[in-house]
Amino acid sequence: VRVFSEPRFDAKVDLDAHLRLVPKDARCKGMFFTHLFKLAEPRMAPERLLELASVSERRFLPFHDYAMADHMRLLHATAGVTHPSSPRGEALRRIGQTIYDGILGSHAGKVLFGVLGLDTAQILAIGPKAFKLMTTNWGEVVSERIDDRTFHVHYRSMPAFLETYHVGTVEGVLAKCGVRGRVRIHVRDLANA
């Protein structure tokens, strides 16, 4: 029996524990890095943000693959920069809430999601398939429609701030579509929910 509960946005977020579980060859697209630079830019230049995150400076191209561990370091640092007075989990959630708009702003996002308009059910159904195009060789996301108003999104082998950032991504989709909803989570461990 799965018990779903409210996400704990005020709980400590252990970056190192997450990073220990990320496969060394796990990759994601450069668009996720550049999205973080845009969010942090009013407060911090990209070069300084990379330094803060201990990520080597280089050019990030939207459709090239980069180390997922570097993205997670940058995401964690960006959360502290963009929402300095919030608990880190809440800050990660807020960044997650922006990612769907960020994806829609890309060419790939327009191709994948543009035709769906504001159809929440279609977006939640297509989202996991898009995940495989935007990350490589790690993790699995599966969306399961339970009824007209309920979806279960399963994350497997994906230690990527599931209770904070990824809850925020679903909240961001709901907000974009003008749907009032509640996101609850069943956390099995850092990589599975």
Regions found by a protein language model. Name each.
Residues 2-108:
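N-terminal low-complexity or simple alpha-helical regulatory segments
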Residues 2-4, 9-15, 19, 23, ...:
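Short terminal or interdomain "cap/linker" segment that borders an active site or interface and mediates
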Residues 58-165, 187:
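Amphipathic interaction/junction segments at domain boundaries or subunit interfaces
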